[in-house]
Amino acid sequence: MPISRRGILVPGATGTLGAALALRLHEQGVAVAVAGRDRASLARVSRACGNAPARAFDAYDLDQCARTVTWAADELGGLDGVVVCVGSTAFGPAESVGDVVAEHLFTINALAPMAFPRAALPVVGPGGVIAAITGVVVDSPPAGMADYSASKAALSTWLRAVRREQRGSGVTVLEIRLPHVETGFAGRAVLGSAPVLPTGLPVAEAVDAIVAALSAGARLVKPGRDAPLDIER
């Protein structure tokens, strides 16, 4: 699909990956709207993207997440897609995580990333896309990351079911199942410390794959055998 007709909303644009994606889309001529939690970071990303429309949101307020989609469609004169880059992590054995942290992870990694596409489905038309980042933990959940992995698996399952529902609609549902990316994300865990991790994928390579997948109308980005990332249509 062409990705520059009307515009794309990037929730989570104040994170390293979301900011890089929004900037890349802007550089390719896409009209972007950016949304995030940190207002100062959001203002910087907006300026870098040619003073793109920007809106702060609280991922715990699911109605606000949904309203952000309507806001973006109004600001951009329509909406072709939403790419959700929101996320949080925690480390530690399941018995040490606690229900408060578990609720946080499921809200930030599943419920909020579902709220944006859910609201976007009636807005984007044929040729549009809804997309969200999950992770390789969906396929192989590691010890010490049970709740994080479960929250990402919930989002992955939801995306796959919605993809089936959207068959014939012309709307693409893209799951971005990334490996470890060098964003510093693991160092911002809400609980615990990350284990020793191998060198992650450069942010630019992850962004390249996401943009290529959006352009191709793909359904999945995942680690590849002969390349860091594969794109499946």
Regions found by a protein language model. Name each.
Residues 14-15:
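Conserved glycine-rich cofactor-binding loop
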Residues 29-45:
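Conserved glycine-rich Rossmann-like NAD(P)H-binding loop of the short-chain dehydrogenase/reductase
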Residues 48-63:
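Rossmann-fold cofactor-recognition segment
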Residues 93-94, 101-104:
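Substrate-binding pocket helix/loop in short-chain dehydrogenase/reductase
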Residues 117, 151:
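Active-site helix of classical SDR
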Residues 124, 140, 161-172:
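Active-site-adjacent segment of SDR/Rossmann-fold oxidoreductases
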Residues 175-176, 191-231:
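C-terminal helical subdomain
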